[in-house]
Every structure is written in C-alpha cells, then in structure tokens.
Amino acid sequence: MTISSNENSASLRAQIQQCLVESGNYEAISNELTERLLKDGWLDEVKKLAREEISQEDSPNFSKALSQIEPQALDLVQQSTKDAIMRKITAFLEEIVETE
C-alpha cells in the first residue's frame, strides 16, 4: 500500500507544527504576526470588511461571510509582514530539516 502525496504532505505539516509548538517557535511567530497585523491596522480593516459583509446579508452565515472576506483579508496583509514571517518560518525549517 502506498501513501498518497496528500497524506505525506499532511503528515509532514503535522510534524512541523508539532516541532514549532514544542520549541516555542509557534507562539513566538504567532505573537509577532499578531503584533504586526495590529500595528498595520489590518485587524481594523478586516473587522470593517466583516461588518460590511454581514450587513449586506438578510441571514448572515459564518461560512459564507468567511469565504467572501478571507481572500480580501489575505490581500490586505502588507508584503513586509509576509516577508518577515516567512523569514522566521524558513529559518526554523532550516534548523530542523536535513538537506543534502
């Protein structure tokens, strides 16, 4: 029996997340991301998007609102924030992953 690529990816992702959590890096990266998003005004913008989306619906639905807001929210993250967080994640991965 062979394991599919998706199963391998999911397993690898779970192992990396476990290492991140156990090392304390998950919390550190998460805290830095939260600080940057707050400083950039991202949270306020996403709240505004959510209020607008919900006010347009007769019967607001979380899943539908999320599907509408999420792409916009991701686009609102400043590139400098994305780059800084990716550098942290990359540095962590370079510490734990053996390369040949």
Curated annotation (Swiss-Prot):
GO molecular function, one term: chromatin binding
This protein's record includes keyword Transcription: yes
Record has Transcription as a keyword: yes
Domain of life according to the entry: Eukaryota
GO cellular component, one term: nuclear pore
Subcellular location, record wording: Nucleus, Nucleoplasm; Cytoplasm, P-body
GO biological process, one term: protein transport
Keyword field: Activator, Chromatin regulator, Cytoplasm, mRNA transport, Nucleus, Protein transport, Transcription, Transcription regulation, Translocation, Transport
InterPro entries reported for this sequence: TF_ENY2, TF_EnY2_sf
Family: Belongs to the ENY2 family.
PANTHER family associated with the record: ENHANCER OF YELLOW 2 TRANSCRIPTION FACTOR
Function description: Involved in mRNA export coupled transcription activation by association with both the TREX-2 and the SAGA complexes. At the promoters, SAGA is required for recruitment of the basal transcription machinery. It influences RNA polymerase II transcriptional activity through different activities such as TBP interaction and promoter selectivity, interaction with transcription activators, and chromatin modification through histone acetylation and deubiquitination.
Quaternary structure and partners: Component of the nuclear pore complex (NPC)-associated TREX-2 complex (transcription and export complex 2), composed of at least SUS1, SAC3, THP1, SEM1, and CDC31. TREX-2 contains 2 SUS1 chains. The TREX-2 complex interacts with the nucleoporin NUP1. Component of the 1.8 MDa SAGA transcription coactivator-HAT complex. SAGA is built of 5 distinct domains with specialized functions. Within the SAGA complex, SUS1, SGF11, SGF73 and UBP8 form an additional subcomplex of SAGA called the DUB module (deubiquitination module). Interacts directly with THP1, SAC3, SGF11, and with the RNA polymerase II.
Name the UniProt record assigns to this protein: Transcription and mRNA export factor SUS1
